[in-house]
């Protein structure tokens, strides 16, 4: 779809939904829903192209997005294989900078990647005036990867993750780090249903989030409520009266 056609489809779907719910959809009240409309509008066209070419559609999700469900089901998750879903976003960004500046042995760097690497990762689903970025929505990707390693690979509870990562990120305040850790655990629990439906990927390092081959987790759970309460209680004790 051309950009104008995609925008027209987005507006048309929004108008139908507004009539169904009996009120206007606004970014203040319906942020996630409006973002997801845009992501899903793209799905039919890419599936159509794959069908026309009798091709395997590749999905774009990486492991960091899978961990916290930062993807639109039936939107950017469309596909039959997800080539980079076995690596974290921070590793992917480091790798792209390495390709730009050095490149593999016997080959050459790819300076054109500078146009990609200079940009902040963004879903580009909110209005441009919002200057949306992934890290503002979630947390810095290097922190997210560290929390994921500690919580999922090493099977630590929130307080243990906090105690492990505090010395590694001294520039981050205790309250902020604890808030990011809580966000990770809540999003992890909330989005297991998405991981059950993501396209398969490759196991390339010491962990994988694919529930069919490595990381089982219940779709419905207690959400680490008791363990997160322990983290908040520890933070209150450290802060003092």
Role assignments for model-derived ranges:
Residues 1-241:
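ATP/NTP-dependent adenylation/nucleotidyl-transfer catalytic domains that generate, transfer
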